[in-house]
Each structure stands twice: as structure tokens, then as C-alpha cells.
Amino acid sequence: GFSFDTQGFSHACRLWTLTLEIAVLMAQFPSRQIALLSHTYRTLGLGYANLGVLLMDRGLPYDSEAGRAYAAAVTALMHGEAYAQSARVAAAIGPFPGHARNAEPMLRVIDKHRQHAHMIDASYVPKDLLRSAHDVWDEAYTLGAQHGYRNSQVTVLAPTGTIGFMMDCDTTGIEPDIAL
């Protein structure tokens, strides 16, 4: 097995959130309406692959409390880092254009994510991973309350498809590995 590189994962989440934010400016969209909505709400799609292999390597059954808690901690860290980074970008260049009319409900949703990150069962998750998830959600909430967010949505959990195979993934999203 290996230890989860919490600092490296957090750094990658911040870096890719910024990269995806920049890509919104350069992206080609299939229709005018999708382009308009993408620029108004600045939705991103940060995600991960190989969760099933991560759990298998840790010796955690996929359909278990331990597996769900570990997956929740990794997901909370990724999602929280992305929103904290989005709030940092908003502090520098402003929130997404549709933020003003969505600020209050969005902050309530962010707070719900923050609260749920603090409810992850600590008995199954490495302390540094869980502490980082807690801290970053507190930061994402605080920064967002001060500056808003640059992006209305930041993450997506979907199969990575063929790119997952190019990254040498055994699983392409959150599904379990089908065989050893």
C-alpha cells in the first residue's frame, strides 16, 4: 500500500481548478446558449479517476463504511480545495457574473458541504486527510462569504472514458475495480 499524498493532491486540485477556470475563456462551445451559460456561471468539471483501485490498495471494501468514509474524505478535499481556489480567484478578479443573484443560496450550499465534511467518520480516514478536508471547507466558506466564488460549480464525478486509459487508470471514475 501507499500513503495518500494529501499535500500533493491539494496542490493538484488548486492548480487544476485555476487551469479549468482559464480554459473557460478559450473553450469552444457547441451552441451559443451553452457558451452564454458557461461564461455566466463559469462551471468547471474537476474530478478524479481510479477510486476503486485506491480503496482496493488501502484494503477497504468498496461497499463498506470504511470505503465510503475514505472516498468521502478524498472527495471532500478535492471539492473544498476547488471552491477555496475559486474564492481566491474571485478575490482577485471578481465572482462569476451570475453570482450576485445566487450568493445567498450558494453560500448555504457551501455551508452544507462544510458541515458534511465535518461529519465524515474519523475512525476510517487518516488524520491528515480528514483534517485537511475540514480545514479547506472552513476556508472555502470563509473566503466565499468575503469574496464570492469565481465558479458556480467546480467538480463532477463522472466516468473519465478513454482519457482514463491514457492515464493508466484501472477504473475510470468512482466504480469498483471489476477484477484483481
Walk through the language-model features, giving the residues of each.
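Long, C-terminal-biased catalytic regions of enzyme "large/alpha" subunits
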Residues: 1-180
